[in-house]
Amino acid sequence: MPLSRRDFAKLSALSLAARFASPLSAQAPNKKIGYAVIGLGRIAGHFLPAAAMSTNSEITALVSGHPDKAARIAAQYNVPSTSIYNYENFDQIAHNPAVDAVYVALPNSMHAEYTIRAAKAGKHVLCEKPMSLNVSEAEQMIAACKAANVKLMIAYRCHYEPTNLKAVKLIRDGALGQVQAIESAFGFNMGPNEWRTNKKLAGGGPIYDVGIYSLNACRYLTGEEPEHIQANISTIDHDPRFVEVEENTSWTMKFPSGIVASCSTTYGANMPGYFRVYGSKGWLQVDNAFVYEGLHLRAEFGDTKIDELNPARDPSHFVAEAEHFSHCVQNNLQPQSPGEEGLKDMQYIAQIYKTASV
């Protein structure tokens, strides 16, 4: 029985409502959560309009090394010039009452520094993934936020996206029977001179940037943590783009229930992000699973067939993400993707490199 668009919307809304559920004693205040956006690159270009579109968030400060760009964006979002900071005077943000939280949208190598500095300034932190360069940095970020009594959320936007949530619900409800295996991949053909090929800035190759989506998806789809990881890493034909970081990574993960996940990521080819889950009673697949729009869920189990294209458009993922974190700040709740979630992925990435002998 195919699910109607109305059924899809209803299920998605219920899933999101469960994500945002709060204790009966919590009452959401009217005040919007003010964000300082740290870094004004590509990813910030999605978050800025999303926060403005959300019901409980707003942009109240900007942090950038490019004053002209910052001034232009500030004018778009009614941010006063006194709330534009650079990386040197960032700590003065502690004295800005309009800033409740920061969104860290910087290269990976800067995540730990600005998360810790923001925490010391008394601001809650929404940090882009990957959380950090390594396990040690992730642990320091968590410790700093706990010491300052501020919240830390890692921006795993797929945790708040309706199609991903629907896939999780179908699995949890047993629609596919016992899950046996998962396949997932995500990659793109990267141009030359990208900061992502600089190991000091990126931490490593595609596993840090796009492969982490497959890694994290296998964890939230199964609801389990992998107990065994095996990986291979390669660079094809001595490609000059990949002197410092690897081009390709493939790995398998075995989970306690016996589920085996097979994943691949690359910077050397366009590999549309997807995951496919095989169960004893059926299967499901989400194409474009990790991009900003065009997510397509297909599934077959029993007499049921699903073929649903999510009509939502960018920046809907970022709206849901911002609203969730702001809701948690307003109501003193633990985010669904806290620092500990990011730490686990950093631990598994370390295992991937170790088993690949890198």
Where are these regions (language model features)?
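Contiguous beta-strand/loop segments that form the cofactor/metal-binding neighborhood of enzyme cores
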Residues: N216-E293, V319-L333, A350
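Hydrophobic residues in well-ordered beta-strands that form the structural core
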Residues: V37, N86, C127, L152-I154, ...
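Conserved SAM-binding strand-loop segment of SAM-dependent methyltransferases
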Residues: T82-E88
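C-terminal active-site/capping subdomain that shapes the small-molecule cofactor and substrate pocket
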Residues: D287-V358
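Beta-strand-loop-alpha-helix segment that lines the small-molecule cofactor/substrate pocket
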Residues: A101-N108, A112-H159, G174
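C-terminal helix-rich "cap/oligomerization" subdomain common to oxidoreductases
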Residues: P2-L3, D7-P29, A101-Y103, H327-V358
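N-terminal Rossmann-like dinucleotide-binding module
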Residues: L11-N78
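Predominantly a Rossmann-like dinucleotide-binding segment in NAD(P)-dependent oxidoreductases
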Residues: G39, K151, C158-F242
